[in-house]
Amino acid sequence: KINEIKEVAQSNNLFLIEDSAEALGASVNGKKVGSTADSSIFSFCGNKVLTTGEGGAIVTNDKAIFEKIKLIRSHGRMDNVRYFENTEQSKYLELGYNWRMSSITAALGISQISKLDKIIKMRQDNAEYISKSLSKFPEIITPSSDGDSEHIYQMYTIRLSSKEIRDKLHNF
């Protein structure tokens, strides 16, 4: 659906932000999630495929958006100025916040990037095993892919064929 959404956004001159918080490494039609919109957002919270314990990232291939994001995340100041050494350039260009990731948190995330494909493969293998094990229960509907997408199984969510079965399982 992201391509349809992008067409609507473009035809109406709208800025498109893709919520990719739980999809790092997933793909649709051979294209990585997070690469279609003007900007995309990924989460690195504790239960994500790649975790830093907290925080996340915004990605874009638009230089103007990139520069704006840098201002917002750094108190509205340019990040190439040494503010404590040069009082002449201590201007706040606009409203901003302290949304910079700490170096130790970033290092934790960077250390996992080389393992990302392996982590995703492990999740996919685990999901396949669980789905196969649950296949003998027709009332349990396991996750599936439409063939054009690669699921990373951020979560493994089942559906049940009826409310009554759901209630019984819930009360078990």
Task: Name every feature range the model reports, one short phrase each.
Residues I2-S11, S27, K63-F172:
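PLP-dependent aminotransferase class I/II
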Residues I5-A9, G30-V33, G55-G56:
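Short, glycine/charged-enriched secondary-structure capping and boundary segments
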Residues L14-F15:
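Hydrophobic "anchor" residues on beta-strands that sit immediately upstream
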Residues E18-T52, E67, E88-L93:
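Conserved active-site segment immediately N-terminal to the catalytic lysine
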Residues K31, N61-D62:
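Acidic, low-complexity intrinsically disordered segments
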Residues F42-S43, G56-N61, I110:
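Short beta-strand-to-turn element immediately C-terminal to the catalytic PLP-Schiff-base lysine
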Residues V49-G53, S149-I152:
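Short glycine-enriched loop/turn motifs at secondary-structure junctions
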